[in-house]
Amino acid sequence: MFSKQDQIQGYDDALLAAINAEEQRQEDHIELIASENYTSKRVMQAQGSGLTNKYAEGYPGKRYYGGCEHVDKVEALAIERAKQLFGADYANVQPHSGSSANSEVYLALLQAGDTILGMSLAHGGHLTHGAKVSSSGKLYNAVQYGIDTRTGLIDYDEVERLAVEHKPKMIVAGFSAYSKTLDFPRFRQIADKVGALLFVDMAHVAGLVAAGLYPNPLPYADVVTTTTHKTLRGPRGGLILAKANEEIEKKLNAAVFPGAQGGPLMHVIAAKAVCFKEALEPGFKAYQQQVIDNAQAMAGVFIKRGYDVVSGGTDNHLFLVSLIRQGLTGKDADAALGRAHITVNKNAVPNDPQSPFVTSGLRIGTPAVTTRGFKVTQCTELAGWICDILDHLGDADVEANVARQVAALCADFPVYR
């Protein structure tokens, strides 16, 4: 028998030490990885609840196990809130991750060997949009579009040319490192021209979409996926959305269960329900606007300091800094910033001469720093510190000076009070 007083402390101190160290790192470091954020304690409470114990294969009202009457209510809440948040007619909250959701969309709507047209990983796309190392690039005939390297913008004429040439069964619109607004009507027009399905992966901008600060793809796409973390600020998980279409809905449900997954993670679905409720609150829009304001302020500092920002700026929560002109690598810059307790990620940029393990760029995002309370003033100052380190890459004195300022700023803006 277990006791409600059981704790990790005193039982598994090695594990507890690692957990505590990570939580302290989150407090002491400035987080600028675009895909990371901090969840509320409410989300954590739901995810750490007794729902962890319940197996519930199937869907609400159609389970393969008994005792699901309460978890049915949990999943129904998550579904209805997701539909309300994004104006969707259909929502599946069971995908374990964004990548799982994408794979399940392909499983539902494609056959092995079908052609898909997605954004190149090297130009800002995602692994699951047809990269050769991904199952999406192994199971399907993946054709890749990219950006115009002169402007940093998606070349929609090139997308259309490729679509006409290759006749894809599905066009994938979405990104992991693109700072401008996607033209969903143009994607829909191209898809209709060649008779393709349009699939939108809005994982990075879902929070902005929910707040009405980024175009909603639902009116244009046949199916939409997202993660529930990143800008949505919920637990790590996936979500599939669609307009009313009984045939597609049945295929999507069957692809998730039993096609790709067994029992859903009910504790995570509960945390998703909390996240969606938080995103429906009036203050969520103000948060998302601040995310954009902070990103634009930071990008402006880099431009003023002589660094190339891909696409010339940002419309959302992230931007890419190219270090090609400075002759620096993303790997070295990432490491130097880490020593100053600033966490970013190295990232490939257009025309990158370096390997994906080295790169010539940095991806910077503002969801996490905005959650801890940073405004434009703090983000402008922070961008200046990053430029100082890049201007004097490898200078231990500069890194130490920035680290001291980072420590003071983190103390003023704790993640959890």
Swiss-Prot record:
Pfam families: SHMT (PF00464). It is found in: Cytoplasm. (6S)-5,6,7,8-tetrahydrofolate binds at residues 121, 125-127, 355-357. It comes from the Bacteria. The modification N6-(pyridoxal phosphate)lysine is found at residue 230. The record marks 229 as: Plays an important role in substrate specificity. GO terms for molecular function: glycine hydroxymethyltransferase activity; pyridoxal phosphate binding. One of its GO terms (biological process) is glycine biosynthetic process from serine. Keywords: Amino-acid biosynthesis, Cytoplasm, One-carbon metabolism, Pyridoxal phosphate, Transferase. It catalyses: (6R)-5,10-methylene-5,6,7,8-tetrahydrofolate + glycine + H2O = (6S)-5,6,7,8-tetrahydrofolate + L-serine. GO terms for cellular component: cytosol. Its cofactor is pyridoxal 5'-phosphate. Its main location: cytoplasm. Pathway: One-carbon metabolism; tetrahydrofolate interconversion; Amino-acid biosynthesis; glycine biosynthesis; glycine from L-serine: step 1/1. The keyword rRNA processing does not apply. Its EC number is 2.1.2.1. The keyword Lipoprotein does not apply. Homodimer. Catalyzes the reversible interconversion of serine and glycine with tetrahydrofolate (THF) serving as the one-carbon carrier. This reaction serves as the major source of one-carbon groups required for the biosynthesis of purines, thymidylate, methionine, and other important biomolecules. Also exhibits THF-independent aldolase activity toward beta-hydroxyamino acids, producing glycine and aldehydes, via a retro-aldol mechanism. Belongs to the SHMT family. This is Serine hydroxymethyltransferase 2. It comes from Pseudomonas fluorescens (strain ATCC BAA-477 / NRRL B-23932 / Pf-5). The lineage of its organism: Bacteria, Pseudomonadati, Pseudomonadota, Gammaproteobacteria, Pseudomonadales.
